[in-house]
Amino acid sequence: MKSKSSMPLPPGVTLTRGKHLQGIWVADGFRFSGFDAVVVATPAFKAVERSNEINERAIAIKGIQDALVVALKETGAFASVVIRADEVKAGSRFAVLETTVFEYEKGGGGARYFAGVYGAGQPVIKVRGNLVDSKGAPLFVFEAHRSGESATARMFGGFRSDVEIQAEDIQDLGIDLRDFVKALVSGH
């Protein structure tokens, strides 16, 4: 499947649908080994910027970075997972995970109250991740789309905040990435 986002993919990369990630690509032979560390860079934001979403957007951006750090630490694939390149020990071989939010909506409680079970008013976040080596060559690319995925977001979303629901979605995104990486590392 080609990516449905308007963001171009790196040359030679074609995303395929994963079990829980909407798009995945892994460089031939890459299995998340051979690196001492990974730097999880601050996510870029390339979605529509709405003036009523400033605070929620900032929370989501920080939440994505935090969730990805936790996810990659839990894989055990890297000795060190950091957020800045200057935190990597000198002489270490490291990769960088660059992420971009390419679609974002904070959601709306009123719509969730009346039709949230059908997806109305749910927050939306779509993220592209690109793990690159020190020369910028892509090693792994993923795309994840979340929109009020949990049962509580659907059933009781009208009584919950946009931030709470989106935080669950972001945590779920991290868990799905962790599980994919762990499966790849273990050969499954």
Question: Where do the PLM segments sit?
Answer:
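A structural "domain/chain start" motif
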Residues: 1-66, 156, 182-188
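Extracellular-facing segments of soluble proteins and assemblies that are Gly/Ser/Thr-biased and enriched
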Residues: 59-92, 100-105
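Compositionally biased, intrinsically disordered linkers/stalks adjacent to structured regions
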Residues: 155-188
